[in-house]
Amino acid sequence: MSWDDAIEGVDRDTPGGRMPRAWNVAARLRAANDDISHAHVADGVPTYAELHCLSDFSFLRGASSAEQLFARAQHCGYSALAITDECSLAGIVRGLEASRVTGVRLIVGSEFTLIDGTRFVLLVENAHGYPQVCGLVTTARRAASKGAYRLGRADVEAQFRDVAPGVFALWLPGVQPQAEQGAWLQQVFGERAFLAVELHREQDDGARLQVLQALAQQLGMTAVASGDVHMAQRRERIVQDTLTAIRHTLPLAECGAHLFRNGERHLRTRRALGNIYPDALLQAAVALAQRCTFDISKISYTYPRELVPEGHTPTSYLRQLTEAGIRKRWPGGITAKVREDIEKELALIALKKYEAFFLTVQDVVRFAREQNILCQGRGSSANSAVCYALGITAVNPDETRLLMARFLSEKRDEPPDIDVDFEHERREEVLQYVYRKYGRERAALAATVICYRGKSAVRDVAKAFGLPPDQIALLANCYGWGNGETPMEQRIEEAGFDLANPLINKILLVTEHLRDHPRHLSQHVGGFVISDEPLSLLVPVENAAMADRTIIQWDKDDLETMKLLKVDCLALGMLTCIRKTLDLVRGHRGRDYSIATLPGEDLPTYKMIQRADTVGVFQIESRAQMAMLPRLKPAEFYDLVIEVAIVRPGPIQGDMVHPYLRRRQGREDVSYPSPAVEDILKPTLGVPLFQEQVMELLMHAADYTESEADNLRRSMAAWRRGGDMEQHRMRVRERMQGKGYASTFIDQIFEQIKGFGSYGFPQSHAASFAKLVYASCWLKRHEPAAFACGLLNAQPMGFYSASQIVQDARRGSPERERVEVLPVDVVHSDWDNTLVGGRPWRSAADPGEQPAIRLGMRQVAGLSDVVAQRIVAARTQRAFADIGDLCLRAALDEKACLALAEAGALQGMVGNRNAARWAMAGVEARRPLLPGSPEERPVAFEAPHAGEEILADYRSVGLSLRQHPMALLRPQMRQRRILGLRDLQGRPHGSGVHVAGLVTQRQRPATAKGTIFVTLEDEHGMINVIVWSHLALRRRRALLESRLLAVRGRWERVDGVEHLIAGDLHDLSDLLGDMQLPSRDFH
């Protein structure tokens, strides 16, 4: 269905048959003088500039993007276009970019509605006016909760008191204009106040024009033409109406007066405007637009300077800290190559005036280290020798081939990225330090624009169109399922929808239009913007959803365009796990290590990695990584760098994985077309796996400069978003052919370069992550109890549930010891999981004994840490005499009592769960009685059945230390001739098998073309099941809903990798009864 068809015939095919009647006459309003084909006509048509236009950053109001609006304005021959989103400048940078492309001048502005109903637009005239608008938006947003604003006349008066306004105020009179509102605006802004005449082809246009002109004359205000634009073209009316319904949470049929009467709030042709407005009003709009000379691209920004001590410049102080770091990092002296790199980098930092930025990041890292918060830089900043010297990153330039141009380049306009990971449980301490250090006036988090995706869009659109909830769910599932090889129409028809139904067509049409349409602002994961002056002079600041957080209205792309620097303070769960593990090792095993001092290149650790015994470690814990480990067989640190990077969309799409593996296994010869190429690609056997290699390759083989190579890198990312790489293909081919390289090699390299457009890792980033991979693997191999305990205490994080972590620890492997795990018990447990028993490590010859893990009360569902701390505090004073004593001294309420009883945490005091429930019930019954009342005689209770106990374990603790559920079901599995996973070990490659297990993971990688990877677990271990897309579609319900899944398929064993190719799937969840098991799906 076309757009034109979509907005006709609405009444007859909509639930209830009641839709906005204006849609029925939309076709009649498409007059010839409003046709886009005649839009840009110069003869006899007045010029025009639109002064009141909302983009899609007026969330759920504006229907069109800045790109669409400026393209339409250009086509219509407008001289300027004001983007005036409601109490927001969130979309203004996109407006700037669209203005640059189209040549239509951007006017910066914002629309406001005061508490008393007064509506007006502020248009920025000059550099003095811009911070005034930013400040007013900030005042309004900070006075309300996230997503709202609150502004009164007193706020406006305070903003412009004692200052000369650098703005123009455009009064937007209501349906019944109130002269007092205009008079007040005139009082605040004087002759800078104008009256907007907005006509939309309604029956009373003539009368309204007369009223407004008379009012303007009465008040002595200049009247100007204005459009109250909500969309680029009239055809987007259906989208705008749908957004209105979504905003008001009403079906379209019930929106009534909330909807506009017609589709005239679009960018109309100048001919159409000439037929509606007197020439004087159009000319007044153009004249006002010409007075708005502010260019937002010229705003100035200064980084904080207070970190520079007296007597130093930023340059000299950064030099001093770098030299101190050099002495610490290289106590034996620095190599000539690294010294040269550092000097070159310091000179470039000074040239770009980034010294204060580096000093700020170093200060944040210093604070974290002083607070014993683990942190580590990542990303392209690991290419910086200066960052390594300052202690920000962990990648030693002597050990890894770095390329500074990937991080910092003289010709690159945007600032460098420095991303630092902090422990996820303690990152808030770091964020609040930044707020304290610079104040909330000068520090705020960047925004993230949350956009509609297919599933969220179709839910909102279908609800607006009145579809029943069950049909909305079915339709939404079509967007959350399937792959690019299955047409959307097929998925929708298979779900039972009739594509011939006009209503369904409209829903799908609007849904597609809303894909990637901004929905609201959220906070960036950790990108801080810090300024030497109040941030609200540069960009509006508003409240975040979280307490004690503020965000600016621009996202990271806007910041890059405006050349504002941000510090990324990110959260990483594995750092929390490692820090807690190291603390446990130090306190319980007597081994004092840091990440940097762990023994390197440890053979037993690499043997464990090669067996894919990596549950719970960093990065290489996913099923895809586990499948790669036995094939790649990492044996040294650089192998881990490759392992981290190779299981990514870029290398996969660029067909780099298999050639690398064949060469590594000696099944394919390695050759290089030149010594320069060999020098670059030899570490990865002739296959470019990293972005830095691509850049270096172009610099040596195609004579690219550092800046040109970096520009290609950025083009790769743009190509992923729909950009063009052909200009680079032609340039690369021409230059490489000129240096004698064969066409086949050039084509191969370029296809691999394009693969990086699907997401390729910088080597520096992979090396940073590989440090944590090795640390987590070493700890898992040599201190398995402490590692499992630390991992449990760092939850939630990673791929695996607490149950899987515990099962893995108890199971052990040929490469690591088994760990005993003890249940939660109020007599012994703390809030955290703890280590008990064992014997300290003395030496390699006397490694001691691994301790056991005592599960902590944090594992008990429904129990808070506050309650647990009260229990521990009371127990520390003296042991509990009985249940009543526990409840009295720990001040336990009924909820806490029940949670402990259900978790079996009272076994050390009263025995089994049934006895605990009875005892707790008795305590509750006796609460009103006086202390010292006689105790009832204990009643003997039969222990629950084993199956009941396991069910209760999973329900209350999320894991069980008893028999695995599959062990209880094993007799039934045998009756069905279903094998255990242990039975697969002796089966030859290609054998047909029938197995079943608990579903613990489902994954659908973007590069897998609809293939689903399922992890099954039984009492003996886990296996990976590969479900091809056609079977996934046919057995969709069993695949997605099963807790216990049976699989018939083909067992495969290749290069040490074992998996099951599914041929058929069956849901056996009924055998589990009410047992609910954790499964991490599609993370």
From Swiss-Prot:
Q: What is its EC number?
A: 2.7.7.7
Gene3D superfamilies linked to this entry: 1.10.150.870, Metal-dependent hydrolases (3.20.20.140)
Q: Which reaction does it catalyse?
A: DNA(n) + a 2'-deoxyribonucleoside 5'-triphosphate = DNA(n+1) + diphosphate
Query: Where is it mainly found?
Result: cytoplasm
Question: What is one process in the GO biological process aspect for this record?
Answer: DNA replication
The listed locations are:
Cytoplasm
The organism's superkingdom is given as Bacteria
Specify the enzyme's EC class, one word.
transferase
Q: Which InterPro entries does the protein's record reference? A: DNA_pol3_alpha_NTPase_dom, DNA_pol3_finger, DnaE2, DnaE2/DnaE/PolC, DNAPol_HHH, NA-bd_OB_tRNA, PHP_dom, Pol/His_phosphatase_N
Name the UniProt key words of this record, in alphabetical order. Answer: Cytoplasm, DNA damage, DNA repair, DNA replication, DNA-directed DNA polymerase, Nucleotidyltransferase, Transferase
Question: Would the keyword Aminoacyl-tRNA synthetase turn up in this protein's UniProt record?
Answer: no
Kindly state one GO CC term assigned in the UniProt record. Answer: cytoplasm
| Pfam families linked | DNA_pol3_alpha, DNA_pol3_finger, HHH_6, PHP, tRNA_anti-codon
Keyword presence, Coiled coil: no
NCBIfam families recorded for this chain?
A: polc (TIGR00594), PRK05672.1 (NF004225)
Membership in a protein family: Belongs to the DNA polymerase type-C family. DnaE2 subfamily.
Summarizing the function annotation, the protein's role is:
DNA polymerase involved in damage-induced mutagenesis and translesion synthesis (TLS). It is not the major replicative DNA polymerase.
Q: What is this protein called?
A: Error-prone DNA polymerase
- Give the originating organism: Xanthomonas oryzae pv. oryzae (strain KACC10331 / KXO85)
Question: Source organism lineage?
Answer: Bacteria, Pseudomonadati, Pseudomonadota, Gammaproteobacteria, Lysobacterales
- Annotated gene: dnaE2
